[in-house]
Amino acid sequence: MKLNKIMLAMVVMSISGTAMAHGYIENPPSRNFLCNAQGGSLNKDCGGVQYEPQSSGETADGFPQQGPVDGKLASGDNWVSVNLNQQTAERWTKVKMKAGPQEFKWKFTAAHPIADFKYYMTKQDWNPNQPLTRDSLDLTPFCVIPGGPASTTGSTTHTCNIPERTGYQVIYGAWDVSDTPGTFYNMIDAEFDGATGEVVVSEWTKSIGNIEPHDDLNAGDTVKLRMFDQQGERSDLVVEITIADAKEGKKNNWSHALASKLNNTHQDIRAGKKDSKGTVTATHGANAIFINANSNILRAEVQIEKSPAGEVSATDASFSANGMKKEYQMADGALAIHFDVKTMGSMDLEAKVFAADNSVKGYKDMTLEDASQHVSIAMTGLKAGKHTLVILGTDAQGKTQQQSIDFMVKGETVKPEVKPEVKPEVDGANKQCTAPAWSNKSSYQAKDTVTHNGRIYMSKWWADKASVPGDAAVTDTTGNGSGWGKVWEDKGAC
């Protein structure tokens, strides 16, 4: 019996010094805690860390000289939290924050002696669409809390003075334990008010639910958004979409389609992400559902009706992207970027272009299996400045890979030469002017001729419905057909 007690004591000591020596920032809620059910599961697609937020970021101590490598500051060496390394301006739920005194509460799964706590923050001008690195952070901690004996209550709280910041910032907290060479690193995604201190009042003040795209859907599956008021379900307000094909069934696509249909159907309900101006816009991913003061809806629910499921591959995969330029010249606020992607295995790829204000200016998705593809993303409404292309790949097992590429958009520094209008004589000007008017309900083959806004255009190759003749991003105005990547050629006035 005595031997058994000794063995039991040894086991307990072993557990407390390793597996149970874990913890996380509970308040303000850290990125990993917001993945967990106790944190409200507000962060999605987190991987295994949703079940054990206390294990996130467990790595060697000594940051910034040692510790986690750049690009893996959230996960460190712990595989359970690798998804937390994904980084875009819209990826993670934000916590409202302001400069000044702020309490930080760490939750421990077991008592463990403390060396110290250190807190760092991103620089004001960091790029939130690049994986987090040491260069993203102010490497002088804004707060250092000396250590002490192990907590006897399962948690500890201390106060730090938050520096001045505006917009989206990341607070990087490190708990250094004193009896092992390890440190636990946690991130807090913080949202500070703008530099003016003005608070934008949005009409979309109350959230009544979410569109959470957990899974891809199959052709024939149906998604319904159901509304409820004090009397029960409002069948007259149901919004429904049916998945037509595999592309529409991608989780970020069907969530965007459902949110867009809701926004186009009802005046007092909106789904999407709320920007700094209080506007709610449908997004590819999780969409919050808001109501304004005119609505009596209390809650909204998403219902998915499945058809027979298709096959799912379980093969590991990876991708690479290249061919992006360092800078592009826009015309009338528009341009198209071109690049090539290649996959090893099968991957769902999602490409987004973020402007300097973190608004999404371009989007494209595709699925490739051991293949290469040239990708073009046409964008309008651009402003000169830094932009970031973020490509996120997901394989059949849910493993992700991110590649972020910065590029500059230049303004129109040189006015294009105004050429005298010459009516085309090939086939006779009058004959070409009788060509059919361009329609956004039709696609066109090579050499098709159309008229639009008083001018004649000829398609150089197949043109889809979204390519509008005359738009700078898709129209060649060189007069000699040399405009690379532009499907329509301007043949002159009609």
Swiss-Prot record:
Residues 435-484 form the Chitin-binding type-3 domain. It is found in: Secreted. Keywords: Chitin-binding, Secreted, Signal. Residues 474-494 are annotated as: Disordered. Transmembrane segments: none annotated. GO terms for biological process: carbohydrate metabolic process. It comes from the Bacteria. Residues 1-21 form the signal peptide. Pfam families: GbpA_2 (PF18416), GbpA_D3 (PF21868), LPMO_10 (PF03067). CDD domains: ChiC_BD, LPMO_AA10. Residues 22-192 form the Chitin-binding type-4 domain. The keyword Secreted applies. GO terms for molecular function: carbohydrate binding; chitin binding; hydrolase activity, hydrolyzing O-glycosyl compounds. One of its GO terms (cellular component) is extracellular region. Probably interacts with GlcNAc residues. May promote attachment to both epithelial cell surfaces and chitin. Belongs to the GbpA family. This is GlcNAc-binding protein A. The gene is gbpA.
